[in-house]
UniProtKB/Swiss-Prot annotation:
Pfam families: Tryp_alpha_amyl
Family membership noted in the UniProt record: Belongs to the plant LTP family.
Protein name in UniProt: Non-specific lipid-transfer protein
General remark: Causes an allergic reaction.
PROSITE patterns: PLANT_LTP
GO molecular function, one term: lipid binding
Organism from which the protein derives: Lycium barbarum
Length: 51
């Protein structure tokens, strides 16, 4: 679904060279923006299971 695609995009962008990405800060961004993402943003997130 769309969330899985978004998740994959986040991980791909991170892997492509956002050096020093702070996943603790990244994980908190959706809440600061008033958006609820039902999965954790981290390198170990399995995007195929995100719905």
């Amino acid at each position: 679904g769309p969330l899985g695609g978004c998740c994959g995009g986040i991980k791909k962008s991170a892997a492509a060279g956002i050096s020093g990405i702070n996943y603790g800060i990244a994980a908190g961004l959706p809440g600061k923006c008033g958006v609820n993402i039902p999965y954790k943003i981290s390198p170990s997130t399995d995007c195929s299971k995100v719905q």
